[in-house]
Design a protein with these regions (language model features):
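Membrane-embedded alpha-helical bundles that constitute the cytochrome b-like, heme-associated redox core
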Residues: 1-153
Length: 153
């Protein structure tokens, strides 16, 4: 069976996204635990201004996701027919769009009622589910060789 091969641009954009999304997601968990916590909190608190850390990851992710989206709808558009590939991009777009619509002081001031914040929380959950679905469908479709093809050049 031939080894799967991925284009270099896809590997770079996917790799950067795969690095930044978990960092943004985990920093968002810390922010949620510190400022909201309606559905639970972490059993510890971390020092620092995590709203700014989370926003920095979002700011780094924004141009990478934009380029990844352009690639996905250009040379990679045939891969979007598989919902396991399309779903994470849609969840990421919702997360970034709703994050851009928020003001960073809302959480510090306890303003949890804004629509943009509710959408951002929804996107946060959807992104976790979408990445899990992405990995499961990838493993079902091509197994470990396909997964490892994103890491090998």
């Amino acid at each position: 069976m031939p080894r799967p091969h991925q284009p270099l641009l896809l590997q770079l954009l996917h790799g950067l996204t795969a690095l930044l999304v978990p960092l943004a997601w985990l920093s968002g968990l810390v922010v949620y635990s510190q400022y909201d916590g309606r559905w639970g909190r972490l059993p510890f608190t971390l020092p620092g201004d995590w709203v700014d850390v989370h926003g920095s990851f979002g700011a780094l992710l924004w141009p990478v996701a934009l380029l990844f989206g352009v690639y996905a709808f250009g040379p990679g558009r045939w891969r979007l027919r598989q919902w396991g590939n399309a779903l994470p991009l849609l969840a990421l777009a919702l997360a970034l769009g709703s994050g851009k619509a928020m003001q960073e002081d809302w959480l510090r001031e306890g303003q949890l009622h804004h629509l943009a914040y509710s959408l951002h929380l929804t996107a946060w959950l959807l992104l976790a589910l979408a990445v899990a679905v992405h990995l499961v469908t990838l493993l079902r479709r091509g197994g470990w060789p396909l997964l490892l093809s994103m890491l090998k050049r």
